[in-house]
A protein has these predicted regions:
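Short, aromatic/basic amphipathic alpha-helical patches
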Residues: 141-152
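Short, glycine/serine-rich, charged loops/turns that create anion-binding
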Residues: 11-12, 42, 109-110, 134-136
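N-terminal catalytic cores of NTP/NDP-binding nucleotidyl/phosphoryl-transfer enzymes
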Residues: 2-31, 36-39
């Protein structure tokens, strides 16, 4: 039977409670079987020398998710090295999990920057997007009307961005309850 799996990519420098809450919300609201955390070796939009080593970020992720059976860490991008392009990772995972249904978790900033990614049309053609909407902060319908996204989405009429609106607690709300 096909599993519902979502890829949660990022630098995770470091992973924090916000990431874990987003993953939990995705599990529940999108009825996922698994969230695959995918730390980037070198994020193309964050080529920064202040990143912790890939090994350290993988270890932090593993410690953060070890008690959650539906969370898994994949070192795929770090093992591959170099700049981590989502289109390459998605293509590899589709071949690695041919019988599963894959989704890509994107926050509002990542969704808006999607047109600047490598081969964004191919990404949209290969995988479903789980768009994170921070309660009271973001509105996915409004974001998809932004000119840069409209242009990408209108390039091919056959593309339909299938977004599951995932409502996550805002980071402001999180910070208020950390103490």
């Amino acid at each position: 039977m096909a599993k519902e799996m979502a890829i949660f990519g990022g630098s995770f420098n470091p992973i924090h409670f916000g990431h874990l809450i987003v993953a939990e919300c995705c599990l529940e609201q999108a009825q996922l079987d698994q969230v695959l955390f995918m730390p980037a070796a070198t994020p193309p939009h964050k080529q920064d020398s202040t990143l912790a080593s890939p090994e350290d970020r993988i270890e932090m992720l593993q410690l953060a998710v070890e008690s959650h059976t539906q969370f898994e860490v994949s070192p795929q991008e770090c093992d591959r090295g170099g700049i981590s392009y989502t289109v390459t990772t998605v293509h590899n995972l589709i071949h690695q999990f041919p019988n599963d249904n894959l989704s890509l978790i994107l926050g509002p900033d990542a969704l808006l920057s999607l047109p600047s990614w490598k081969e964004p049309q191919r990404i949209l053609g290969l995988i479903k997007i789980l768009a994170i909407e921070r309660h009271g902060v973001d509105n996915i319908e409004q974001l998809t009307q932004e000119p840069q996204l409209q242009e990408l989405l209108s390039e091919k009429q056959s593309y339909q961005i299938k977004t599951d609106r995932i409502r996550a607690v805002s980071y402001t709300h999180l910070r208020a309850h950390e103490t």
